[in-house]
């Protein structure tokens, strides 16, 4: 499966040029934003961890091993990319225990920058946002067009597609999900089951969003839409009055798309017809998600880009900094600017 099949059309026109992303881990930096004041006491030890070339699950295993704890005693808010320099929180459940010596977990690819006690464990999805610093190298672009495009996406946002990372190499996770759906079976292994169910829901969401982008309605409220605020998991039905809400224009309020699960579609009008059409075409995949007891959820169609800034440290390097809500993909922001080409290696340090 190619990129267009897995995501959909761009909203702001063809790419303004091309560049390389992730020539080194420092080219893709992620800082988790967590709005939780720590108490300084309690049976949970929270760790602020920097890791390079290491995914979240691998880091959790390292920390658990060094602490002499079962893996289930280590918690984190969200998964971060392996091919990146990331900083995120972990928590260790240590009832009645002293802080462990975690030196064995640390090395060139993992450093514990801060630790503090708290009275609660870190829950999945607890982070409010992620801050990104991206360096795009080997830049070949129309600079004037790129500047205009950057201004435009800062003002209008971009389609909130799930990124290619969600689907595996050449969409392999979607292919596997369809195979299981055809047999109406669920993978026995928990991690595989979670990955394939997530890929299936993400793919169907992207299909709906792709049609809204093609129709020019991805950033507009329609009667029958379900609307949600940035960062909120609650939503409400749009009537004529709601479609004129001024908070839509300032990117606080957005139309949403389906994360499929059990129950009827809660949308109405043309929105429900479009979403039902995607469900009908997917057939077995939707039935499979229902069989897996997935609950129907919603995700905003439009991705607002917080605090977008940029500069050119070298003529052929574009450096971006911005903040996205949790669960959103920096690569879909870049996709509205540039085509990405395979990475070589670069020694240029990332300094914003």
Curated annotation (Swiss-Prot):
A Pfam family: TruD
BP terms from Gene Ontology: tRNA pseudouridine synthesis
Catalysed reaction equations from the record: uridine(13) in tRNA = pseudouridine(13) in tRNA
CC annotations in GO: cytosol
Name of the protein: tRNA pseudouridine synthase D
The keyword tRNA processing appears for this protein: yes
Functional description taken from the UniProt entry: Responsible for synthesis of pseudouridine from uracil-13 in transfer RNAs.
Keyword Membrane on entry: no
Organism for this UniProt entry: Ectopseudomonas mendocina (strain ymp)
Record: active site: 81
CDD domains attached to this UniProt entry: PseudoU_synth_EcTruD
Family: Belongs to the pseudouridine synthase TruD family.
Root EC class: isomerase
EC number: 5.4.99.27
A GO MF label: tRNA pseudouridine(13) synthase activity
Alphabetized UniProt keyword annotations: Isomerase, tRNA processing
Gene: truD
Domain named TRUD: residues: 157-303
């Amino acid at each position: 499966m190619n990129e267009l099949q897995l995501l959909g059309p761009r909203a702001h026109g063809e790419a303004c040029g091309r560049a390389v992303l992730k020539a080194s881990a420092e080219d893709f930096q992620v800082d988790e934003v967590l709005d939780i004041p720590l108490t300084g006491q309690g049976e949970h030890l929270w760790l602020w961890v920097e890791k390079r070339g290491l995914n979240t699950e691998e880091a959790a295993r390292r920390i658990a091993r060094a602490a002499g704890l079962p893996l289930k005693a280590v918690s984190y808010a969200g998964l971060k990319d392996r091919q990146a320099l990331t900083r995120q929180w972990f928590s260790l459940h240590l009832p009645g225990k002293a802080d462990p010596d975690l030196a064995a977990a640390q090395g060139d690819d993992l450093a514990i920058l801060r630790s503090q006690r708290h009275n609660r464990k870190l829950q999945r999805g607890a982070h409010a946002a992620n801050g990104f610093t991206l360096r795009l190298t080997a830049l070949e672009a129309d600079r004037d067009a790129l500047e205009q495009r950057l201004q435009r996406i800062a003002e209008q946002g971009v389609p909130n597609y799930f990124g290619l990372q969600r689907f595996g190499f050449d969409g392999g996770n979607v292919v596997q999900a369809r195979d299981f759906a055809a047999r109406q079976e669920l993978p026995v292994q928990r991690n595989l089951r979670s990955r394939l169910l997530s890929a299936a829901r993400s793919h169907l969401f992207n299909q709906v969003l792709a049609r809204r982008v093609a129709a020019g309605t991805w950033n507009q409220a329609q009667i029958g839409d379900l609307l949600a605020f940035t960062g909120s998991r609650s939503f409400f039905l749009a009537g004529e009055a709601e479609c004129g809400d001024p908070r839509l224009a300032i990117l606080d309020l957005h139309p949403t798309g389906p994360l499929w699960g059990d129950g009827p579609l809660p949308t109405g009008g043309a929105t429900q017809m479009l979403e039902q059409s995607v469900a009908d075409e997917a057939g077995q995949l939707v039935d499979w998600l229902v069989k897996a007891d997935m609950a129907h959820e919603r995700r905003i169609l439009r991705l607002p880009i917080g605090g977008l800034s940029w500069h050119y440290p070298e003529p052929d390097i574009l450096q971006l900094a911005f903040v996205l809500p949790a669960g959103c993909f920096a690569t879909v922001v870049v996709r509205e600017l540039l085509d990405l080409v395979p990475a070589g290696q670069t020694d240029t340090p990332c300094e914003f």
